[in-house]
């Protein structure tokens, strides 16, 4: 159960903002064939990788971007190519590959100055330490990252370091310290800073306060996340589909809040709202959360047969996806609930 909570908390914010559309990718690939080997071509490759980031084509195009960027001595795009490799391997929990690309990325970033991306990459690496229960190593590395960010006056690095500290504390059952670190990350967020970073921190805060049964704080952060999302989509309407998973998350955790405060009908309305964001491309963890909240709703109104059916669906998805994609044993709340109804 502990590792499942960590997976939920650490995965938010890493797959944001890019709709995976074959049409957009095909159009850019056609354009790529006609472009000269200059920065325009590098920019187009970069755009293709963002679309293809969740499949193996990401690695193929990132390799091409790295080779062509190095040939042109373009440290910016070489740094980004390393970052995309890191993100791909992080999402597959491949610790050695992440470590290899951190080593390759750092000297490139020292030339390009893309420290925000580097600190994001370090966050991936440290969160994998936490996920594999190397908590003291994660805390030590997060403190090193915090000092490095302080030395070069990088806000993104400071925020990421506190996020990592929070995850490590929570993983080792130091919940109060974890919440304190996460609230420090929240305090450090610039008022008009990167919306994706704010969404990531708020999502973690919502997850943690829900697990701690702190309903008042959970509602506060849910309302802020909703406001941030709405403003971001108004300013960037073309990215709405790419943020569908975050909308699902927000509606599901509103439902948790209302179930925890004995308001099942309001919870149900948010579960229904979340349904419209589900697609075949929805990240599997969000699908699990969707079916799990339905089970909890039916438990709350004592319709145990329906609850059991949704728990079965949740268990099937966990067995199929988590053991395959994350190499995890199945120890979940859904399993405990299923035993209760058996």
Walk through the language-model features, giving the residues of each.
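Sec-dependent N-terminal signal peptides
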Residues: 4-13
């Amino acid at each position: 159960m502990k590792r499942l909570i960590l997976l939920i908390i650490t995965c938010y914010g890493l797959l944001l903002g890019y709709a995976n559309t074959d049409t957009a990718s095909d159009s850019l690939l056609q354009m790529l064939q006609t472009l000269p080997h200059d920065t325009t071509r590098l920019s187009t490759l970069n755009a293709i990788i963002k679309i293809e980031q969740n499949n193996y084509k990401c690695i193929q195009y990132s390799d091409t971007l790295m080779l062509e960027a190095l040939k042109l001595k373009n440290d910016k795009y070489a740094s980004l190519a390393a970052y995309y490799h890191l993100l791909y391997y992080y999402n597959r929990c491949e610790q050695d590959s992440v470590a290899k690309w951190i080593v390759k990325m750092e000297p490139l970033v020292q030339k390009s100055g893309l420290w925000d991306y580097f600190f994001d990459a370090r966050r991936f690496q440290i969160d994998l330490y936490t996920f594999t229960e190397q908590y003291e190593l994660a805390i030590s590395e997060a403190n090193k990252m915090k000092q490095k960010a302080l030395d070069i006056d990088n806000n993104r690095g400071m925020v990421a370091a506190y996020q990592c500290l929070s995850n490590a504390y929570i993983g080792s059952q130091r919940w109060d310290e974890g919440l304190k670190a996460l609230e420090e990350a929240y305090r450090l967020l610039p008022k008009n800073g990167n919306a994706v970073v704010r969404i990531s921190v708020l999502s973690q805060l919502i997850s943690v306060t829900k697990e701690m049964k702190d309903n008042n704080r959970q509602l506060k952060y849910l309302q802020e996340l909703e406001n941030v999302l709405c403003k971001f989509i108004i300013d960037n309407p073309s990215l709405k589909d790419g943020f569908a998973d975050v909308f699902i998350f927000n509606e599901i955790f509103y439902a948790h809040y209302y179930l925890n405060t004995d308001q099942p009908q309001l919870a149900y309305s948010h579960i229904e709202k979340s349904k419209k964001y589900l697609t075949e491309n929805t990240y599997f963890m969000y699908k699990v959360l969707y079916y799990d909240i339905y089970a909890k709703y039916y438990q709350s109104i004592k319709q145990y047969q329906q609850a059991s059916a949704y728990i079965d669906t949740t268990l099937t998805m966990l067995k199929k996806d988590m053991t395959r994609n994350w190499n995890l044993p199945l120890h979940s709340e859904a399993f405990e609930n299923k035993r209760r109804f058996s």
